Amino acid sequence: MANESILPAELIALARRVVVENSALGRKLALAESCTGGLVAAALTEIPGSSAVLDRGFVTYSNEAKIESLGVSPDLIDTFGAVSIATAWAMARGALKHSRADVAVAISGVAGPDGGTALKPVGTVVFARAQRDGEVQPDGEMKLL
């Protein structure tokens, strides 16, 4: 069937909400994804009308990709790690800089099954947002999912 998705219904419902609400505001989004590997962009593009909202997405799984594609400082990654609010915010700022979006969202995390630490166990995910309206304060959140 043409309308079925391989993505979970809950994810599609959230993506629909993102598309509808941002479309109503006339707002364009850019994504900088690491641990999700493009899944957020895939979910958004499942929604009719997403082309009015999604400007572009960057999948920067490796530290090198974060540095080369988004301009994240190697020193920032060395100091705080790839899974940190500082790095995620730099990813969001880089996505904003390299796009025509009004808002950029970045996601980085420890997907597992290996790679976790006592401070950042497997399942730790960091979200950050940057806006083009001149906001200069980091807006991010770290969660254990």
Language model segments and positions:
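Short alpha-helical segments enriched in small residues
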Residues: 1-145
